[in-house]
Structure formats: structure tokens, C-alpha cells
UniProtKB/Swiss-Prot annotation:
It comes from Tachypleus tridentatus. Its main location: secreted. It is found in: Secreted. This is Coagulogen. Pfam families: Coagulin. Disulfide bonds join 28-187, 30-115, 80-181, 85-141, 95-188, 108-160, 147-190, 154-192.
């Protein structure tokens, strides 16, 4: 009996560790090739459903979406409002200028680009649909600051290290038809480190 229980416990631990370390999860947002290699997984029906839900929130709060943040009236979503495309700038997504990265003097060459993620993996490794509702006036953007690999600007005794930061974005729960404010990791800088 004890051997059976031990075997079941070992199996559950293995399954949990495999699920926790999802190999599909990329380093940064917007790097996902899509589930099973598909580049687009958010169907037109889901997009329309999200648009209608965002429009309902905008009408409920009396906010058009083109002025103040649609979700700013709710304290839980206040953190998510700063990544709206109309207000976010590249420096908002940089991390190495702030603690604990101020001690890095050099930065490797960085490729900077903006993106509008439609899905991604949370910091807990859970797959989520990220809210993008352009018709309702709500779009979320992040700026990626990724190392240009192959650069040798750290000198002979260091190497480029990709730093990531956590951003809070509005997601849509399809099962419960509701919004959440969740954390995702995104690339934010590339300091040189000596090893």
C-alpha cells in the first residue's frame, strides 16, 4: 500500500513539474509562435466577445476609452492601465536604469520594438488571452528591449545578460467571462555582467 501511495505521489510530482516548466513559454511577450506553431489563436468570435465586454465596461463606467483608461475606476486594474498603446513609451519598459540594476555600467546593443500581445504565459506559466479591443478604444502595448546576440561589447571578461521585468496586463477569462489583471514577463534591458 505504501509503495502504491509513493508511486502515485511521484507521478503527481512529475506531472506538476512538467506543467510548471512549460516549454512553450518564451522568454518575452510577443515571441510566441503560437500554440502548436499557429501564429493566430484568437478567433474572430473571441475577439468580438472581448470587444463587446470592453464596450460594456466603458458604458458602465462612463469612459469612452479614448480619454481615461477604461479600467482605471477599479482599484484592482489601476496597475494595468499604464500599458495602453496611446500612452506607453519605450522608456516605460526599461528596467536596468532602476534598482537593482543601477550597478551595471554597460549595456549590450539592444533591439527595441513595440508589440501588442494577444496571448501569453503569466509569471505562473499559465496561458492567457490578453485583451486587445481596438474598436472599443483599448489596446495594450509593451516595448521589448532584447539583447542583440553575438555582440561583444562587454569586453573580454563579461557577457550580455537578458533582463526581464514584470508587466501587469488586462486578460480575459473565457470560462468565467470576466477580466483579470495579471503579471507577465517581458524583456527590458541587456546589461553587461562580468563572470
Amino acid at each position: 500500500m505504501e509503495k502504491k501511495l509513493f508511486g502515485i505521489a511521484l507521478l503527481l510530482t512529475t506531472v506538476a513539474s512538467v506543467l510548471a516548466a512549460d516549454t512553450n513559454a518564451p522568454i518575452c511577450l510577443c515571441d510566441e509562435p503560437g500554440v502548436l506553431g499557429r501564429t493566430q489563436i484568437v478567433t474572430t468570435e473571441i475577439k468580438d466577445k472581448i470587444e463587446k465586454a470592453v464596450e460594456a465596461v466603458a458604458q458602465e463606467s462612463g469612459v469612452s476609452g479614448r480619454g481615461f483608461s477604461i479600467f482605471s475606476h477599479h482599484p484592482v486594474f489601476r496597475e494595468c492601465g499604464k500599458y495602453e498603446c496611446r500612452t506607453v513609451r519605450p522608456e516605460h519598459s526599461r528596467c536596468y536604469n532602476f534598482p537593482p540594476f543601477t550597478h551595471f555600467k554597460l549595456e549590450c546593443p539592444v533591439s527595441t520594438r513595440d508589440c501588442e500581445p494577444v496571448f501569453g504565459y503569466t509569471v505562473a506559466g499559465e496561458f492567457r488571452v490578453i485583451v486587445q479591443a481596438p474598436r472599443a478604444g483599448f489596446r495594450q502595448c509593451v516595448w521589448q528591449h532584447k539583447c542583440r546576440f553575438g555582440s561583444n561589447s562587454c569586453g573580454y571578461n563579461g557577457r550580455c545578460t537578458q533582463q526581464r521585468s514584470v508587466v501587469r496586463l488586462v486578460t480575459y477569462n473565457l470560462e468565467k467571462d470576466g477580466f483579470l489583471c495579471e503579471s507577465f514577463r517581458t524583456c527590458c534591458g541587456c546589461p553587461c555582467r562580468s563572470f
